[in-house]
Amino acid sequence: MVNGDLRIQYYDEELNIRKVIEQADLEHLDQALNICDLSSLERKLRLWHKLMPRIEPHYAVKCNDDPVVVKFLADLGTGFDCASKNELKLVLGLGVSPERIIFAHPCRPASHLRYAKEQQVVNGTVDNEYEIYKLRKHYPDSNLIVRFKSEAKKALCPLGDKYGCDAEADAAALMLLAKALGLKVTGTSFHVGSGCSEVEAYDRAIEKAENIFKVGEMIGHKMELLDVGGGFPGIDDEMFEEIAQSVNTSVELRFPDKRIRIISEPGRFFVEAAYTLICKVHAKREVRSKDGKLDTMMYYLNDGIFGAFAGMFYYPEEVAPELYLDEAESLPKLKSVIWGPSCDAMDKISDLLLPNLNPGDLLGFRNMGAYTMPIASPFNGFDVPETRFFKAK
């Protein structure tokens, strides 16, 4: 049980970041520190069940694959979206049954398919004829979930250029091919894009899914699973409520038969808000104009875009660090740049206004739980952040 995990520290009412920092002995810690509030995951799951009780969440492991996080969600009863052999190993190794897993990658290496077969992970996505032939050879008893393209007009990371067949031009042909080869198509899936901010995107996709279900049944497949993918926001609960209402309405209209199982692949929804990253200023320098006037303050932190900020390569955003200084808000602000620790000039986190800081001062960055640590690297020999876990008693 998670409650027996010695890596988790417990707090009474509310996690006090300042108190954690005071007790963390950061003066002697070279790398940055992640503070993960696991109770945030519990709150998110309660919100999910409240707003979308029919939709089974299958956590997207790629979003944050820390074993403590994955184990915590497993103990709460979520399913899992895995995309590789190693992700399957992680989840299965924690005691999760194969029935709670969808192998949600349309283009998998043959060795990964053979491993899924050995472990009886039967549900997996497909979006092209080559993958169907591969499945006939390596895992003919699997359940094929046809993934189609249906993108949001607003998303942080669109996925349609890489994955998803055309719902009208390709889906029927793929299901016919599967039938001819003696394979089972049991459902369909889509992904509107990571970090979706267009409510209507899900209804458009679910309408396409309804048509694919009808065609699949006509071909002779037993269609029984709809996967509505991911894209659910991690820090905008108001947006999530709007999306949930849209999904519920569309599902009830187009899939009223409760025997049809409906799952999803939320990632950032669960973990984005759970993490706060604490960085330390380890060096500073002043940039002055030719006449000697101070122009810019440069601060060098112990983490950067090769670490937990790596996602900024893909979707740059403004950062708003919290300062753990007395009366920080009242201090005069200076034009500043915060850099990561590496030698690479691309390792720049942000231009912003900050009070005068000194080596040893700390900056906190909230909402750092999604697509951060899995893509962080120790480039230039700088360690990736350490993570410490907390939970309400």
UniProtKB/Swiss-Prot annotation:
Residues the record lists as binding substrate: 314-315, 344
Residues of the site described as Stacks against the aromatic ring of pyridoxal phosphate and stabilizes reaction intermediates: 191
Binding site residues for pyridoxal 5'-phosphate: 194, 231, 265-268, 371
Any GO molecular function: ornithine decarboxylase activity
Modified positions (N6-(pyridoxal phosphate)lysine) in chain numbering: 62
Active-site residues, record numbering mapped to chain: 343
Catalysed reactions, semicolon-separated: L-ornithine + H(+) = putrescine + CO2
PROSITE patterns registered for this protein in UniProt: ODR_DC_2_1 (PS00878), ODR_DC_2_2 (PS00879)
InterPro entries assigned: Ala_racemase/Decarboxylase_C (IPR009006), De-COase2_C (IPR022643), De-COase2_N (IPR022644), De-COase2_pyr-phos_BS (IPR022653), Orn/DAP/Arg_de-COase (IPR000183), Orn_de-COase (IPR002433), PLP-binding_barrel (IPR029066)
One Pfam family in the UniProt entry: Orn_DAP_Arg_deC
EC annotation from Swiss-Prot or TrEMBL: 4.1.1.17
GO cellular component: cytoplasm
Cofactors, names only: pyridoxal 5'-phosphate
Protein keywords: Decarboxylase, Lyase, Polyamine biosynthesis, Pyridoxal phosphate
GO biological process, one term: putrescine biosynthetic process from arginine, via ornithine
Pathway membership, UniProt: Amine and polyamine biosynthesis; putrescine biosynthesis via L-ornithine pathway; putrescine from L-ornithine: step 1/1
Activity regulation: Inhibited by antizyme (AZ) in response to polyamine levels. AZ inhibits the assembly of the functional homodimer by binding to ODC monomers and targeting them for ubiquitin-independent proteolytic destruction by the 26S proteasome.
Function: Catalyzes the first and rate-limiting step of polyamine biosynthesis that converts ornithine into putrescine, which is the precursor for the polyamines, spermidine and spermine. Polyamines are essential for cell proliferation and are implicated in cellular processes, ranging from DNA replication to apoptosis.
Membership in a protein family: Belongs to the Orn/Lys/Arg decarboxylase class-II family.
Self-association state and partner proteins as the record states: Homodimer. Only the dimer is catalytically active, as the active sites are constructed of residues from both monomers.
Name listed for the protein in its UniProt record: Ornithine decarboxylase 2
Organism, scientific name: Drosophila melanogaster (Fruit fly)
Record lineage: Eukaryota, Metazoa, Ecdysozoa, Arthropoda, Hexapoda
